[in-house]
């Protein structure tokens, strides 16, 4: 029996998630990708983290900022604490507890930045204005750019070759429990409406990942993922409606179609890569990494980092100012 990965509705079994060092995963169990999706494919988690990055610490900070029930907020904060993202620290003389981002939690800043940048560029309508991002190093508003850590050049999906590593497989990479969007519909789109359409369901996230790894035909997605055909059809249709995939007739078979990432879909690559990088730093399988990447341009193992599009220098979390817009 392998440990069940934690989800937003329940803690992990038997695994310890230290706030300052990686989780040691069980052999043959859910890998880093599965744990990462279990945590990030939940809109409430992302919203809680968004405000934590901006300075929220007390329960009341999130309660006042979000249309969230007491039960859901309590459950999500407990889950993120269990996963080592928050730690409880006393304040007001020890009578109350604050939720402080740990080293593991603070390390999520690249994921949030790339989500905000993608939503700002490709999604026209948001209930709440996306935050302003300022690079303290050059003093200007910026958009993060994904570059190769080895050579410093910007990369797109076609520039990076990916494959499963020693702990990688589709069965180990999909969270055991279905992930979901908000537990309580508010009647309006969230801060990350299309991000959650892409990764807010375990099969959606898996289909997007398969597309980045080269899946094109319906048969590719079905064979690689093992998802129900109706589920794959529904997700492919949604991705086409969002403009993330384009549907094209297969050569010589006009009755069949292939699915290719559009410019909008390819622009989501930094989100996927920063999320995977965070997961593989903080969830370690004994067999080795779940995914390995090579930069075709320089031939080195690919490890991404974010750079400022205005001055070109690598970004550090301490040099990024996140401000709410009035």
PLM segments and residue spans:
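DNA-contacting interfaces and partner/effector-binding or oligomerization modules
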Residues: 71, 78, 82-87, 96-150
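Basic, amphipathic "hinge/linker" alpha-helix immediately C-terminal to the N-terminal HTH DNA-binding motif
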Residues: 41, 92-114, 253-272
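Short, hydrophobic-biased segments on the C-terminal half of alpha helices
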Residues: 77-78, 236-237
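Short, Lys/Arg-enriched N-terminal segment that forms or immediately precedes the first helix
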Residues: 17-37, 172-196
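C-terminal regulatory/oligomerization modules of transcriptional regulators
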Residues: 2-16, 120-184, 284-326
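Residues in the helix-turn-helix
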Residues: 72, 231
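N-terminal helix-turn-helix DNA-binding core of bacterial DNA-binding proteins
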Residues: 31-69, 190-228
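Beta-hairpin "wing" of winged helix-turn-helix
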Residues: 81-95, 242-255
């Amino acid at each position: 029996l392998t440990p069940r990965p934690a989800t937003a509705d329940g803690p992990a079994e038997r695994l310890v998630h230290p706030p300052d060092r990686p989780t040691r995963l069980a052999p043959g169990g859910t890998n880093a990708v599965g744990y990462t999706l279990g945590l990030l494919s939940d809109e409430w988690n992302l919203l809680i983290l968004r405000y934590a990055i901006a300075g929220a610490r007390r329960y009341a900070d999130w309660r006042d900022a979000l249309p969230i029930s007491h039960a859901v907020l309590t459950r999500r904060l407990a889950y993120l604490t269990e996963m080592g993202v928050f730690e409880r620290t006393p304040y007001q003389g020890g009578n109350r507890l604050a939720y402080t981002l740990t080293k593991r939690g603070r390390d999520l800043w690249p994921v949030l930045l790339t989500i905000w940048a993608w939503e700002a560029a490709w999604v026209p309508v948001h209930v709440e204005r996306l935050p302003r991002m300022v690079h303290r190093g050059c003093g200007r508003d910026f958009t993060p750019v994904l570059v190769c850590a080895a050579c410093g050049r910007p990369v797109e999906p076609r520039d990076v070759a990916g494959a499963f590593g020693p702990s990688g497989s589709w069965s180990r990479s999909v969270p055991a429990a279905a992930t979901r969007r908000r537990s309580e519909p508010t009647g309006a789109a969230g801060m990350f409406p299309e991000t959650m359409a892409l990764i807010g369901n375990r099969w959606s996230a898996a289909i997007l990942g398969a597309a980045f790894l080269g899946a094109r035909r319906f048969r590719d997605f079905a064979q690689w993922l093992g998802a129900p055909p109706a589920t794959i059809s529904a997700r492919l249709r949604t991705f086409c409606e969002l403009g993330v995939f384009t549907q094209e007739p297969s050569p010589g078979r006009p009755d069949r179609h292939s699915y290719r990432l559009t410019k909008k879909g390819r622009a989501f690559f930094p989100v996927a890569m920063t999320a995977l990088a965070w997961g593989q730093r903080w969830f370690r399988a004994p067999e080795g990494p779940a995914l390995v990447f090579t930069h075709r341009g320089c031939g080195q193992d690919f490890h991404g980092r974010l750079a400022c599009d205005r001055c070109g220098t690598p970004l550090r979390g301490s040099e990024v100012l996140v401000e709410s817009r009035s």
